[in-house]
């Protein structure tokens, strides 16, 4: 309720010449943190439901009827939480999928890198060597092994200073609000040039 009322007041004041919507939406996760809750990204829900958001905001600002904006924010929190849960479930299942796909030796640098790719889906060999506390050569070899297995893709085309991406993680994190995570995973696999899991 506080988030909805504060947001509608902020939008009514319109303190900046540009960016009020972005700043107003940025205040929500800060309010969540201040109240002791984990922050939740709800802008995706707003973008998908822009007309309802506008109507609810106008009712609060012009008629002082806050019920619509409170209901909208509640719906946004519930839907965004469910969307985040789906994203988390899809991401946390990836290391097992990758292990099956690559048949990596247990505790090898390649196997250990799988967990790091969830946390850092775009990385260099230097970053991986730091994270795993292995030599640059061991990290480079691990990334080559992961690339052959269809876990990562090298993005630069360079011979040196190469950047690797776990495209399935990137696709999941970049997917439109509400999209089935499996559709995003298929897109990531397509970028990797592989079929299925």
Predicted regions and their residues:
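Basic amphipathic alpha-helical segments that dock to polyanions
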Residues: 117, 139-149, 164
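Phosphate/pyrophosphate-binding active-site loops
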Residues: 1-89
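Short acidic, hydrophobic short linear motifs in intrinsically disordered regions
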Residues: 114, 119-132
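Short alpha-helical segments that sit at the start of domains
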Residues: 83-114
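Short, cationic-aromatic polyanion-contact patches
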Residues: 106-107, 154-178
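Short, amphipathic alpha-helical interaction segments positioned at domain boundaries
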Residues: 168-197
């Amino acid at each position: 309720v506080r988030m909805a009322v504060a947001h509608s007041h902020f939008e009514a004041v319109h303190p900046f010449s540009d960016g009020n919507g972005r700043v107003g939406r940025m205040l929500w996760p800060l309010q969540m943190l201040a109240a002791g809750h984990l922050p939740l990204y709800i802008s995706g829900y707003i973008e998908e439901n822009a007309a309802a958001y506008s109507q609810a905001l106008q009712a609060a600002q012009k008629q002082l009827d806050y019920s619509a904006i409170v209901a909208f924010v509640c719906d946004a929190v519930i839907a965004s939480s469910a969307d985040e849960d789906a994203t988390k479930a899809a991401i946390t299942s990836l290391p097992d999928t990758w292990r099956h796909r690559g048949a990596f030796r247990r505790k090898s640098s390649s196997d250990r890198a799988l967990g790091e790719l969830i946390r850092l889906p775009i990385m260099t060999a230097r970053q991986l060597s730091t994270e795993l506390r292995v030599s640059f050569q061991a990290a480079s070899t691990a990334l080559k092994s992961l690339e052959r297995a269809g876990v990562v893709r090298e993005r630069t085309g360079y011979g040196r200073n190469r950047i690797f991406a776990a495209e399935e993680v990137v696709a999941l994190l970049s997917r439109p609000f509400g999209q089935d995570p499996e559709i995003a995973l298929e897109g990531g696999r397509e970028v990797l040039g592989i079929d299925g899991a």
